Amino acid sequence: MKINFIHKIQHIGIPVHCMEVSIPFYERLGFENVMESPFEFDGGFGTCVMMKNHEVIVELYQMPEKQLAEIKERKVGHIDHFAIDVEDVDYAFEALKKAGFDIIEKEPTFLAFWKNGTRFFNVKGPNGEIIEFN
């Protein structure tokens, strides 16, 4: 059976240490808080925030205090990176560099992927997440 019902990434979930740091970080990348809700987990309460930029949705969730220590000890969270398409990699690189983002590479990197190759760079988020721009 061929699975043909997957259309696109719906959202990317990132466990965060502190909403007060994470929300402004994603706002600086052009994301908007489109939903915020508390949730109950294991006798405590956490917070979930959906951040949206065009068709890209990032779910930031802060677990209750009891689970927060384990999340803070993670090096890269549950996902090691997620990628965002940009129109012009060089423009995005310079704009984010000028804005003071923590860019991992010194310049966009070329990989011989796909038919014509791809260029990308990565930004480190406040919770150890890596955001690839290509």
Predicted regions and their residues:
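Vicinal oxygen chelate
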Residues: 1-3, 93-134
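N-terminal beta-strand motif that seeds the catalytic metal site of vicinal oxygen chelate
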Residues: 1-21, 79-84
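Core segments of cupin and vicinal oxygen chelate
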Residues: 6, 14-57, 98, 114
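Residue-level marker for the onset of beta-strands and adjacent loop->beta junctions
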Residues: 10, 46-47, 80, 119
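Short, conserved charged micro-motifs
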Residues: 21, 90-94
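Conserved short beta-strand elements that form part of the metal-binding/catalytic scaffold
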Residues: 34-73, 123-134
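Structural motif
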Residues: 55-58, 79-81, 118
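Electropositive, surface-exposed helix/loop patches at the edges of structured domains
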Residues: 67-84, 94-101
